[in-house]
Amino acid sequence: MLKAAAAALYRKNSNFLQGLRLLHKMSDQDLAKIPLVDIDEEGIFKYILIRVTGKETADGTEPSKLVVRGYADCEWHADIYERTQGTIKGTGLDTECLGGGRIEHNPEKKYLKVYGHSTGYGKADHAESKRVLLTKYKNYEIETSDEGY
């Protein structure tokens, strides 16, 4: 009888653990699907740096990555964040805005300038933003500056 109870408990816990592994796998897959960079193709516009985080893994770590978002049609940095949250909603991923600024994007010159700050979210780490932008714009000159709004 004790063996039967132990076997049932093992099966129950095994199924639970398999379910957890599946959730983490789904979370990792969802995280992998989030593009690192989504900015307008040209112009000067506000941008934000966001940390996207998956579910905590069995070893206690939380998989995450930094993403850059910037759109000319968003009047406020908060508008960019809301749009991004809307695209991630329902995936089980969490987001945190780490700050913002502006981007000047000139595709003819293959040039990006990352500068300024967000009044609401503070200044993003422009060096980190540059690192993320380089994943998409490998052959661009990317300048960073703490000057300007």
Swiss-Prot record:
Disulfide bonds: none annotated. The lineage of its organism: Eukaryota, Metazoa, Ecdysozoa, Arthropoda, Hexapoda. The active site is at residue 77. GO terms for biological process: cell differentiation; sex differentiation. One of its GO terms (cellular component) is cytosol. It comes from the Eukaryota. GO terms for molecular function: protein histidine phosphatase activity. JanA and janB regulate somatic sex differentiation. InterPro entries: Janus (IPR007702), Janus_sf (IPR038596). Belongs to the janus family. Substrate binds at residues 46, 118-120. It comes from Drosophila pseudoobscura pseudoobscura. Keywords: Differentiation, Sexual differentiation. Pfam families: Ocnus. This is Sex-regulated protein janus-A.
